[in-house]
Amino acid sequence: MESFLQNPLPTRISELEEQIALIEAEQKRCTESIRGLMAREDMEKGIFFPAEIHELHQRKNMLETHIQYRRVRVNRLRMRGAR
């Protein structure tokens, strides 16, 4: 999944929408991982995962930025009449 994030944005709406769907799925996995880590934390035993949770939040935010770039590109292409 990471490979296409480093390439230039596609110029076809269908490709952009496919990428948005993939990125949203990865965001969902991040959210599930965050919830899982938070559920496993135990204050009494001193079990915490702050670094892992922070990293996942950062990843989720980065993915949101990629989604926004793709949505802007889709909107621009639609304004120009592309498919």
Task: Locate each region found by the language model.
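Heptad-repeat alpha-helical rod positions in long coiled-coil/spectrin-like domains
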Residues: T11-S14, E18-E32, N61, T65-Y69
